[in-house]
Structure formats: structure tokens, C-alpha cells
Amino acid sequence: MLRQYKEQIKSSPQSCGVYKMIGDKSKVLYIGKAKNLKSRLSDYLQFENLSERIRVMISQVIKVEIFITENEIEALLLEAQLIKSLKPSYNILLRDGKSYPYITISKHDYPRIAKYRGKFKKNEFHYYGPFPSAAAVKNTILSLQKAFLLRVCSDQYFSSTKRPCLEYQVKRCSAPCVDKITKDDYCKSVKQAQDTLLGRNKEVQRQLFSTMEKCSREMNYELAAVYRDRLKFLQQIQMQPMDFSFEEDADFFSVVREADLACIGVLSFRDKGNYGSIPYFIENCSDHSNDEILSTFLVNLYNPVNTPPAQIYVPDFIKDKEIIEQALYALTQKSIKVLHAKNSKERDLLNFIYNNSQHSLEQKLTDYRNNLEKLEELRKIFSLPNIPKRIEVYDNSHISGNQQVGVMIVAGQEGFLKSEYKKFTIKEEISGDDYKMMREVLTRRFSGNIKDIIPDFLLIDGGPGHVSIVQNVLEILNIKVPFACMAKGHDRNAGNERFYVPDREEFTLASDSKVMLYLQLLRNEAHRFAITSHRKKRDKQFFASQLSEISGVGSKRKKALMSHFGSVENISKASLAEIQNVPGISKGLAEIILQHVNSKKGTPK
């Protein structure tokens, strides 16, 4: 194989292009680009300079395919296109991290304070942050609650409760839900909390101190003590008075690396405001330069729909600015400026996203190392040949044999792989038989379209009866995968779980051991996904049956309503005009639908 590879290199052109490394059964192992194809492919023969991962890859290469391009820009775009469509196993892997956490204050009449991650909804919330960690958000919210007595309950709870909750009893909320505070006074507290989050602590402290002195002069010592306590809690909040605004639409990027992992941080500004930030993790990148990593990332991030802003700021060590500009223009037909920081404001923003990316990378690596420790213990306990890279966990859910759903969740060395979760709708005739349900799920999993992906370990939510079912399915399909069944103990308390493995006595683990807690986490995640999937299926059927009762709503209109609103509750909250906007729904029919669903309010879903 290596001799054949060397022969191909000899005939390779010294021009710009893209190369595709192909292994056994025409499997695409790697796709790369180069200014000089012959020179780049020759580099792979310098084994002493290659990482272990790339050495293993080269040993599997049977042939190399070459695509000559006009220039580097065309090569960059073609490489990105081929990687997206073919997903080679040895290429850089891009994973979204959790977005950085923010504090939100809602635009409700009685605003709620909460932690938030995700896309911004500026018509619903005011955003403050981002914060470096969820713990920082939690501590800040707690101090703001104590200082300003703001509510954290949901809007639904707020509108329906008749008495103050525990937050009021422990002096963390002023109970606006039951009029323990006037709307004006509550909104003043909200404004002071907002000023604090914007770094105006001194002004807020001055206001509180002035009010405390006034109460004291009027001998209202009880109220003076309240403001004294507010001042104390306010001093615990250390907000950075950094200006998170930018005059132009712009994205700021950082690249932080350690070993084979990189974190690219993105801080976005649109309409002169902070539009959110998120870390992306790049795996298998030790053989790539920072310029290669960032340019590849950018042509994957932006597209004609998700268009880049007019300005993109990158660290000073990024040199291929012109190539990135030209590639983004070719991709979006939009002129983009890729810039280095020119003033203190721009440098501050680049430093901010760099520091947050550094924190995210450190947290990611810490989590990874902790996971590896647990997986090594799991390997020993269940006598696995290697530390598992892919664990699949199975669970079923139904109510009296109805809306039966089986699920598979997947965990790897870095945590849950939610994009690989699967749901299995169970056949009706099984009627709640858990053993038959598990047989069907496993049979479909290992004979379906992902049958070639073999996990390193299976964890089944079940007892000794499930062991023979799993064994039988795997034997019939000629698949060898180690597995264990995990059942709750006699009292069904967490920590008393029993494990059942073929050819071994049942056993348990110490309730506080890391492995037991990890296995409980896996089982609970599968259970959560099963319950959620079952509930969605049940709600969908209930939704369909509710609409079937309405004269004039046939299968086509029912499908349109289901697609548009998703639930009966959402229809009941909609306006007449919104229902009319659904294709095929007239004003008269919209009135009938709205009247019908509102008459059914309170029906359990």
C-alpha cells in the first residue's frame, strides 16, 4: 500500500488543489487542500514528523485522488464542500459547545430574572453577560434576588398562584404574584438590578444607602434593616463594567489550543448590541496551523443564509486575511473585511472572547479527563477490552401499553452525543410487553441503517429477564458487544441498583462510587429521553384527535395546523388572525377552531 502511495506522489502535480485519501472498501479517510499538492503529499512520508493518529491513517491509505484547482480560494471551498458531504473519519471534527450563559430579565409586566443559553429573543428579554460559567450566573442571580427580591418563577406559575412561595419565605422574592409589593416598587427594584448588571453598582448603592438613612431618620428601623441587608448582598456582586456594544455589525474570533483540541470563540454584534457568543470545539487539529483551522471553520460557519457581517476581527497571529476574505466573497457574494484590532475597544473584545475560550477549553479538558477516569473504572468492572468510546443505553416507555416508544441514547468520552440519539415507535400488537419491546428495538438498531456502527458497550434498563433477550438478538445477528442490564433494587432507591451480566452473578456497586453515579447518569438520561419522546407522541395523538372533532378540519388541514402550532395549547393562545394565516383556514373556520380548543382547556394532555 505504501509503495502504491509513493508511486502516486511521483505523478502528483506541483499545483494548488484538493486531495482525497481513500482506504479499504472505498472509505474516504481524509480530505485536505494544498498550495503544492506534490509537496504536501510528500510530507506524509516523513513519519517521524507525523502524529500517531496520522501515522495510523497513512497505514490504511490504498489510493489518493487529486482535484486541481485554479487557486487557494477554490481549494478551500472545495475542501469544505467535500468534507461536509463525505464526513471523512480523520478530518477535523467540529462540535458546538454550550453557548456562554447570560442573565435575562424578561419584558413581562413583573419581570423575571433567569439564566439563559441559546439564541437571543430580544423582543422578550433584556440580556446581560456573557458570563464565564454557569456558576457565576447562579451566584449573581442569587445575590440579585437577595438584594432586590426579584421573582424567578415561570410566567405560568406567576399568573396562577394564590399564595407566596418558598422564595418569599426565605426573603429572596417580594411576592408580586399576590400583591405583596406594588407594581411601581417592583419595577424600581428591577431597574436597580439592571443598573447593577450594567456595572452601575456605585449609583445603586448610593440610592439604597440614601433610602436606608431616610427610613432610619423616620424611625422605621425594620425597613431600614431591609435596605441594610440589600446593600450587603449588593456588595457581593462583582460585575465587570465592560461595554458590550459595538457600533458596526461585527464578529470577533479567538483561537485557543491545547494538544489535539482547539476552541474557537465567537462574539457577535448586530444592531449595535451584543448578539450572543458561543465556543466551538475543533478535534483532531494538531496537524493544522491556526490559519488552516480558522479559515476552514469560517467557510463552514457562514453560508448564503447565515451571512457574515461586514467586519470580522481575528487575532494578530492570523495571517491569511485576504484568502479568508476572498473565500467568503465566493461563498456569499458579499464583501467582507477580515481585520486585526486597531484600538483598545477592539482589543478588549478580542481579549474577552479569548479569555472565555480559554476557560471553555480548560473546562472541556477537565470534563474529558474526569470522563476517562470513570470509563477506565467501567472497563475494569465489566471486563471490557478497551476504554469504551461509544456507549449505547436503551430504555422503553409506555402507559398501559399505549404510545409505546423505545429509545437509544449515545455517550462517548466527551459526554452525551445527542445528535446520535434514536427513537423507535413500537408496533401496536406488542401491547406493553417490555421484553418484546426491547427485542424489537435492538433488532431494528442492529439491522437498520447504522448497523455498521458497533458500540463498545450496551447498557440496558432492565433486569435478569432482559439478559437472555439481548443475548438472543445479538447471537441471531452475529454481533459481539459486551452489555449489562441495570435494574433498580428492591426499594427502587437510587444507589441500590443491581447489575446483570452474562455468565456472572448479579452484583451492585458502592452507591457513592464515581462509576455508579456515572451509570445512573446514563440510565437517567435514557429515561428522560424515553419519557420526553413518549409524551411528544401522546400529545401529538391527542392533538390530532382534538382536531378530528372539528367539522371542516380534514387530514390536510389537520396536518397544516399541527405543523404550524405543534399543540392545542398553542392554538388556544393564538389570535384569530394567526390561525387564519395557516393555509386552507378561512376566517369562519378559524373562529370555530378557536372556540373548540378553548372549550377543551383543562383537558389533561
UniProtKB/Swiss-Prot annotation:
Matching InterPro entries: GIY-YIG_endonuc, GIY-YIG_endonuc_sf, GIY-YIG_UvrC_Cho, RuvA_2-like, UVR_dom, UVR_dom_sf, UvrABC_protein_C, UvrC
Domain spans labelled GIY-YIG: 14-92
Record domain UVR: where: 202-237
Keywords linked to the UniProt accession: Cytoplasm, DNA damage, DNA excision, DNA repair, Excision nuclease, SOS response
Compartments where found: Cytoplasm
GO biological process: nucleotide-excision repair; SOS response
Recorded GO MF terms: DNA binding; excinuclease ABC activity
Primary location recorded for the protein, binned into one broad class: cytoplasm
PROSITE patterns: GIY_YIG, UVR, UVRC
This protein's GO CC annotations: cytoplasm; excinuclease repair complex
Family, similarity comment: Belongs to the UvrC family.
Role played: The UvrABC repair system catalyzes the recognition and processing of DNA lesions. UvrC both incises the 5' and 3' sides of the lesion. The N-terminal half is responsible for the 3' incision and the C-terminal half is responsible for the 5' incision.
Subunit structure: Interacts with UvrB in an incision complex.
HAMAP family: UvrC
Entry protein name: UvrABC system protein C
